[in-house]
């Protein structure tokens, strides 16, 4: 066997293995970018020796064979995949190939869409009624998922409107919005179920359940993007026209579909979508670019596994492979001990990543991770990089187990794990230097006491030199003592003292947030302050009384109750008040007497506001009788969505909650 034949055999075997893991087992082991690289390498070798191309080569077909647990459906019109481009130069070369094949010097009109990261499906309607649905499978035969698809509310069981073809096969993507993905994993962690690595795996796992009742509980959705069978009817002669017709018949279509009349317009669309990607509320991995004219599509035709008239323009990979060199353990302000993987540095989505959170001991066990393992790292938007999975097929021989500490790595105190919680915590409290540092950094932060000029490095030095043990000690600092710190001159020291003095005048909500009570964020602190009005009333509240506050359940109520029951915490509060920390007396609001559209409503703010700060908006809403919550739930009455609204907006839409924009909020504030 020639060396090139050996290379081809190995590449095909490797690709088939990963196709099986991806399409059949829903458990991909390598990132898409690595699969694409292997496929490109195989194509290049086959281009050198076309006589060695075999009919079963991965370059000659689409995917892997379906599971035998489902009935099979043969696609009358094969479900092909798309070729990919990864940079502007490759796209421009594709554009030129299309123009050359069309023998045209005029710009092609392109229809540009989002490349959804879900599961491709085919849905057949006969006389407007849904009769079957199938996965892509290997492109010619897929799995019968009709019962499961019927549970997806976004997909109509019957089309409405006129001139519906006798047989119409719609193709599109089933996917899981980010909010739904987070909810599924949250429920799984609570019940000990399977935690999914990403929304795509969750969507595939949900759709390919043998029990449709499980699928029905998952918030899957769908966008259509193409057609297969078309009999007994007509469709418009452009791709965009067809999408608009689908929408008119009741099929969901993405609202991010754009016609582009030049290559530059396509590149602009690509860049704009990439910029908006973190705020879409669902995962995409690029854009799809199609010749808009159906006549030109027919003229261009197909290659073995993909159309010549379309291409997927993929974003820089959000997943890459690297090695775990070590695992260190960090201690947070609540004592939570978090394992952090130290990685062989790797570029992920344009950022050099050398660390990734491992969350807790359960996550390490779920991954089966060992030090020295080859892993897939994912970084999506601003999310902290995380380990998606271990590449077990490439595990080195010299790996070693990760041993969770039995004592705090900072102060040496015992660690504990409360039954029902995934987190291991240091029991040292404020005797632990790490907890003390993080608690003080939180206390002085902008959204808490807002002490200008007191950064993390100053806090680190104050704790390390034993100048400060509790938040109250901060207000006893003098300019003279601060001047002794590194890179702190007399003027800077006096500025910090002045900032501390200014910070004494605060609000009840900010003060509560600054205390760092577990699970009490800004919105919960504001809710507690508004409901109880005074510190004395809050300290005297029972767990049952605390649960009457919007968005406060048994877990948060217990943390708040336990915090105020702890004598050392009460002592710190007394000291803070003695040092002059104060806030305005509460203004009692009778919601029944307020003539406002917000009175008595539970409101959630999401996204960025341009006309006022978020704090100002909250204050004005509360003054008009609203309860401002931090998360969307069935109890939410209204969501105000600013620019770049993300998962909260998606969840509101999923729950059918009324959504208004900033302009409407301002109009109602003045009503």
From Swiss-Prot:
Keywords: DNA damage, DNA repair, DNA replication, Ligase, Magnesium, Manganese, Metal-binding, NAD, Zinc. It holds the Pfam family DNA_ligase_aden. Its cofactor is Mg(2+); Mn(2+). Its EC number is 6.5.1.2. It catalyses: NAD(+) + (deoxyribonucleotide)n-3'-hydroxyl + 5'-phospho-(deoxyribonucleotide)m = (deoxyribonucleotide)n+m + AMP + beta-nicotinamide D-nucleotide. It comes from the Bacteria. DNA ligase that catalyzes the formation of phosphodiester linkages between 5'-phosphoryl and 3'-hydroxyl groups in double-stranded DNA using NAD as a coenzyme and as the energy source for the reaction. It is essential for DNA replication and repair of damaged DNA. InterPro entries: BRCT_dom, BRCT_dom_sf, DisA/LigA_HHH, DNA_ligase, DNA_ligase_AS, DNA_ligase_CS, DNAligase_adenylation, DNAligase_N. The lineage of its organism: Bacteria, Pseudomonadati, Pseudomonadota, Gammaproteobacteria, Enterobacterales. NAD(+) binds at residues 32-36, 81-82, 113, 136, 173, 290, 314. It is an enzyme of class 6 (ligase). PROSITE patterns: BRCT, DNA_LIGASE_N1, DNA_LIGASE_N2. GO terms for cellular component: cytosol. Belongs to the NAD-dependent DNA ligase family. LigA subfamily. GO terms for molecular function: DNA binding; DNA ligase (NAD+) activity; metal ion binding. Residues 593-671 form the BRCT domain. Zn(2+) binds at residues 408, 411, 426, 432. This is DNA ligase. One of its GO terms (biological process) is DNA repair. The active site is at residue 115.
